Amino acid sequence: MDVDIDPEQLFTEKMPKNYAQPDVLNHTFDLLSNLHKLLPNHLVEVLHSYRSEEDKNKCEKPEFSGLEKILARHQLPKEISLSPKPSLMPSWRRRIINNISGNWKKCHLWQKSTYEPPMGTIVARWTKKNLQPTEDLKSVIQRLSALGPIISVTPSGRQSAVVVFRDITSACKAVSAFQSMSGGSMFQCSWQHRFMAKNKTWSRKCTSKVHLEKRESTVGEPQELHN
């Protein structure tokens, strides 16, 4: 349905409209969707100015563009180039459809990723401050390699990296030693694996086991030297 636009009537109309009525709202939407017909298309005028007389004679309708000539040749309806009409669907039905289409978000299977990182994977983060010693990727790798063998290091941004240890004990040492950036430390390690990040009990047990082994090794060394 084409809407005839009268510019004088458009700008001189003073009667208030009741947009609660569907007919008034639809007419206003159709009027706004056809306002582009009042705007001059300077690019098309410039394009037509470069046409030769021979090209104009070849075209049945020289004022049409290439797409418009295709539409005219196939005799497609005029509504194909217009803006879509407003939907007359009731709000309660649209709400039901939106709820049905959004139910897939509640499925927990979609939230699980197919890739699970190794258990000994941690995320190392560091910050740079003027009054503190600067940290970079090289110094972070040196500090973490002292805790155990590292399989891979993947930079993730300018001040973070994903580090994979060969064994989970070394990862526990790193997370236990660098839990937060407090106390003047500009370096922090956290778990990347969801199981290790959620299960704090396992992380504490592994960390306490590491401290116990370290304490036993330090206690046993003087005895071996004494013997």
UniProtKB/Swiss-Prot annotation:
<protein>
    <recommendedName>
        <fullName>Testis expressed protein 56</fullName>
    </recommendedName>
</protein>
<dbReference type="InterPro" id="IPR027827">
    <property type="entry name" value="Tex56"/>
</dbReference>
<dbReference type="Pfam" id="PF15023">
    <property type="entry name" value="DUF4523"/>
</dbReference>
